[in-house]
Amino acid sequence: MSGLLKLLMMITVGCRTSTAHRRDPSGAAFRAAWARCLGLCILLPCPAIAATPVRIVAAENFYGDVARQIGGADVTVRSILSNPNQDPHLFEVSPSVGRNVSGARIVIESGADYDPWMAKLLEAAHGAERQTIVVAALVGKHPGDNPHIWYDPSTMLVLAKTLAADLAADDPAHKSAYERRLGRFEASIQPIEARIAALRGKFTGMPVTATEPVFGYMFRALGMQVRNMAFQMAVMNNTEPGASDVAAFENDLRTQKVRLLVYNSQATDPIAMRMQQIARQSHVPVIGATETEPPSQTYQAWMMSELNALDHALAE
């Protein structure tokens, strides 16, 4: 029992005792005593009632990470896709995931057909009041575009600003805290931008290739010339690349027309593995890129790690 509650009980007992030994047919003395007791209760300090954190559900953990960095202790975040050893394209929705979405105040999805299962979850939870952020829509991307938009750090800056504004609207008591954390997030992206600028000075125009367009937006930021896009899009869409596209890819590797091969380390198939083998036989550097943020890393550390791996591979 709290000290405040004990004190209130003592006051109440005292008030009753002070009037019990006297006869007061009108009850005036009793009412006056209670008024004095209530006055004391009003003057006593009361413990503050903690605000309920804003519940956020993110389809992917890199968006959940940004939400956590902006929201801090004022939010709770659940990320649906968070296992870097799982192929995101094979994800299946479970009832527990649906329950989490239905209770969220803010939902973040990637859009551009990367996580189409989110639309079904939101439709099933149609009665709830929530704010839905579609990141692809924030940056002008649509179905048919490369959906791996988080590999462009500017995308995450746009998301962070949107989150800070939405959280401030939903929870105005902590508006200044959200704005302060947004400022820290923006500052933390600057080293990534500086690293990209430095690497762009070294690698602009360099021909590179990939088994899927996971790293595509980062390639573009680095000024690299990306080849074999028809092959990459076919693999991403789980369709068989055309024979001419396969032949062109193999030729680029065997003749070293490309300086680097990036593969999706979360989604491998026989033809992608074959390209890796040919690249290694042809002494073309090979690095893996993940679609999902690795555990115990922030988005910032993850992107810096990917950039360092690219720089190291090309320096060999």
Please tell me what each predicted stretch does.
Residues 50-316:
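Extracytoplasmic metal-acquisition and chelation regions
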Residues 18, 38-40, 146:
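Residue-level detector of alpha-helical transmembrane segments in integral membrane proteins
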Residues 1-32:
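N-terminal secretory signal peptides that target proteins for export/translocation
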Residues 27, 47-49:
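Intrinsically disordered, low-complexity segments enriched in proline/serine/threonine
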Residues 35-47:
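Bacterial N-terminal signal peptides
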